Design a protein with these regions (language model features):
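Electrostatic interaction modules used in gene-expression and signaling proteins
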Residues: 1-118
C-alpha cells in the first residue's frame, strides 16, 4: 500500500486524494522530512512527530488550490508541489524553533535550578 508507513490520522486524511496526487504528496512529504532532518542533525523528526504539521500544510495547500480555482486559475497538487514543500518545511522550522526554545527554557530557567551561578 502506498501509505503504509504513514501515521493513521495522516493516512485517513490522505485517502481523500486521488491516487496520482497521493504519489506526489507522499514524495513531497518524504523529501521535506529528509531535507529538514539533514539540515538539523541535532533533532531527528519521525513522521509521527510531525503529523500535525503535515496536516496543517496539506490543508493550507488544499485551500490555496480552492482559492485559486475560484479566481479562475487551474491549480493541481502537481503544480503546487513546490508550495507544498515550502509549506511543510516552514511548519517544521516552526516546530524546531519551539522545541529549541523549550529545551533552552528548561536548561536556563533560574526557577528550576537550571542555572548555576557558582
Amino acid at each position: 500500500m502506498l501509505l503504509q508507513e504513514f501515521p493513521e490520522q495522516l493516512t485517513n486524511y490522505l485517502m481523500n486524494y486521488h491516487y496520482k496526487d497521493l504519489e506526489v504528496i507522499k514524495t513531497v512529504i518524504l523529501k521535506a522530512k529528509k531535507s529538514f532532518n539533514s539540515r538539523h542533525e541535532d533533532m531527528h523528526y519521525m513522521l509521527e512527530d510531525i503529523e500535525d504539521e503535515i496536516l496543517i500544510s496539506l490543508k493550507r495547500v488544499k485551500k490555496a488550490i480552492h482559492d485559486r480555482g475560484v479566481k479562475g486559475q487551474k491549480e493541481t497538487i502537481i503544480s503546487m508541489q513546490g508550495y507544498l514543500m515550502s509549506t511543510i518545511l516552514s511548519e517544521l522550522e516552526e516546530l524546531y524553533s519551539a522545541d529549541m526554545r523549550r529545551q533552552n527554557m528548561t536548561k536556563y530557567n533560574i526557577f528550576n535550578g537550571g542555572v548555576n551561578f557558582s
